[in-house]
């Protein structure tokens, strides 16, 4: 049995072709932080005949089962990523919509200190930073605009 079949069964979901295909697409590195509409278009490009309503339904089931995490970034559109990843925070460009994942030990430690200061046992957290492209908004045409500076 494949890992994806087992993952669906472990989540209490029946193994169906649409669920397997959607899970396969979500596992592609370039398909993190993907909307339902973008996922649907990707499936069409792969010649998969899965309707948009099915994509929405499966993503909601995956979210409920903990297979994916739903994010509501600025702009109101939900995007999804697999939940199996390590903890990370997000930096979102408001000009082009690029979502950059990052981890920073100093930020993580500071969040723990703040929680302790207010006598709160931190069980979970998420950090979203929003900003505009520092290179005059031309990031829409520049694929390297958001690469880390050295």
UniProtKB/Swiss-Prot annotation:
UniProt entry keywords in alphabetical sequence: Cytoplasm, DNA-binding, Iron, Metal-binding, Repressor, Transcription, Transcription regulation, Zinc
GO biological process, one term: negative regulation of DNA-templated transcription
Region of interest: Dimerization: 85-143
Binding site for Zn(2+): 33, 81, 90, 93, 96, 101
Listed InterPro entries: FUR, Fur_C, WH-like_DNA-bd_sf, WH_DNA-bd_sf
GO CC annotation: cytosol; protein-DNA complex
Principal location listed in the UniProt entry: cytoplasm
Binding site for Fe cation: 87, 89, 108, 125
Lineage: superkingdom: Bacteria
Molecular function terms from GO: DNA-binding transcription activator activity; DNA-binding transcription repressor activity; transcription cis-regulatory region binding; zinc ion binding
Subcellular location field: Cytoplasm
Annotated region (DNA-binding), positions in chain: 1-84
NCBIfam families: PRK09462.1
Oligomer status and interactors: Homodimer.
Task of the protein: Fur acts as a repressor, employing Fe(2+) as a cofactor to bind the operator of the iron transport operon.
Annotated family: Belongs to the Fur family.
Identification of the protein by name: Ferric uptake regulation protein
